[in-house]
Amino acid sequence: MIYNEQKGDLFDLDEKFALAHCISADTNNPKSWGLGIVKEFRKRFPYIKEYVDLTMEKNDLTYPCVIIHYVSNNNSIKDDRVIFNLVTKAKYYSKPTYSTITKCIKEMACLCKSMNIKYLGMPKIGCGLDKLNWDKVKQIIKREFKDLDIQIEVRYLL
């Protein structure tokens, strides 16, 4: 694993990077997509909310889990960008725990391995509005991805 963390816009990463962010399980609540970086994901990927809503409902999913969304770059599945939606909490106003974020990160690492994803970008997941300690979350990420052939880029604005 190659790990890099720096100030910058997550969405400036090359499109070869899969992206990850945290969401709540109450995705059908309009407020659940209205704050933080999740709002920016919805703005940049307009169909993400509807896809996640449908996936949660159709599969009767509960948190913690990871929902994969593909964003088509040019109508070719092999060129689709992968977005990992880490469902780390029940309600948009609640907070995740280290247990739920660990389960999601572990699942995402397994998915990256099975999908042969070599590039992953993310914000400081669970640490903005969700208030988890970044040093702890970073250690979870490094532990779960340590044996993978992947480059992880973390971006933050503040």
Mark where each language-model region is:
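Macrodomain-like recognition of ADP-ribose-binding/processing modules
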Residues: M1-L158
